[in-house]
Design a protein with these regions (language model features):
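Cys-dependent protein tyrosine phosphatase-like superfamily
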Residues: 1-55, 68-166
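Ser/Thr-glycine-rich phosphate-binding loops at phosphate-binding pockets of nucleotides
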Residues: 59-60, 64-65
Length: 166
């Protein structure tokens, strides 16, 4: 993780702050055509008649997983405020993990204090990250649900199937 974060420090610095970088990263996850195709594949799998459970996660459990959960909960009819609140709980559950990563950054990363502060900001699941990308989606599509229909390729039938399954 430290190598990836260090390799991205120029992009982080260009954005001005860790928070701005995170918002731009979330926008990339949402609006990148390749990412959209991966999300479509995920929802195709979720709509299949499968035995057992499906688990999804990522390294930190907040970025790609957070966007996936935004999409799934939207399709299930969960309120936007509840989705954002749920996303924000990631910081509670990752508190120990984040603390250890902060310590590693402070001690072992050969970079300035400012860059370290920016990198530390990346560890957190701030509601502002998700709110910003939701607002950008709404600006372009009117709602997250419209975005899922227009860009991800979700159909009303898929949404109804997911509501039956979950």
């Amino acid at each position: 993780m430290a190598r990836v974060m260090l390799s991205q420090k120029h992009r982080i610095t260009e954005c001005g702050s860790g928070e701005e970088y995170m918002i731009s990263m979330y926008e990339n996850i949402v609006f990148d055509k390749s990412s959209q195709q991966h999300f479509k594949t995920l929802f195709d799998i979720l709509c299949k008649d499968l035995d057992g459970a499906i688990l999804y996660h990522c390294t930190g459990g907040k970025d790609r997983t957070g966007i996936t959960t935004l999409y799934l909960y939207t399709l299930l009819g969960v309120s936007e405020e509840d989705i954002i609140e749920e996303f924000s709980t990631s910081d509670i559950f990752n508190k120990k993990y984040n603390k250890s990563r902060e310590t590693l950054i402070k001690i072992f990363m050969p970079t300035s204090k400012r860059t370290k502060a920016l990198l530390i900001a990346l560890l957190h699941a701030k509601r502002e990250y998700l709110e910003a990308v939701i607002n950008k989606i709404k600006d372009r599509h009117g709602s997250v649900l419209n975005f899922l229909y227009d860009e991800i390729g979700i159909t009303k039938e898929m949404q109804e199937k997911l509501q039956l399954i979950f």
